[in-house]
Amino acid sequence: MAAAMETDEQQRIRFQLELEFVQCLANPNYLNFLAQRGYFKDKSFVNYLKYLLYWKDPEYAKYLKYPQCLHMLELLQYEHFRKELVNAQCAKFIDEQQILHWQHYSRKRMRMQQALAEQQQQNNTSGK
């Protein structure tokens, strides 16, 4: 019952700690570290990962700087994925895929922004 009576300060600290931890899950090397030390075999830790799924709610997700952490959190719900993370090659593969995603995402986003800017410029000149 005492745990339900958190002060505002305790709630703020818990929010910050959970936010930081969830974002750490975006790092495949950190996931490999956790797997090699047996955290993913601990039932209470796996339950904690399940509890953290509330971060997928837009009310909380808006605070995330690394949204790919939510995808990793989702994958961590699967035992097979947790077991594979012990292998450093698995973490390396995930890391490489994230880099490729961001490289292509950045280029695509830049092209989209340029096209939007050109369209706005055309609209401004044709509207005069």
UniProtKB/Swiss-Prot annotation:
Subunit text: Component of the Mediator complex.
Family statement: Belongs to the Mediator complex subunit 31 family.
SS bond list: none
Organism: Xenopus tropicalis (Western clawed frog)
Subcellular location: Nucleus
Keywords, sorted A to Z: Activator, Nucleus, Transcription, Transcription regulation
Organismal lineage: Eukaryota, Metazoa, Chordata, Craniata, Vertebrata
Tree of life domain: Eukaryota
Annotated protein name in UniProt: Mediator of RNA polymerase II transcription subunit 31
One Gene Ontology term from the biological process aspect of the record: regulation of DNA-templated transcription
GO molecular function ontology, one term from the record: transcription coregulator activity
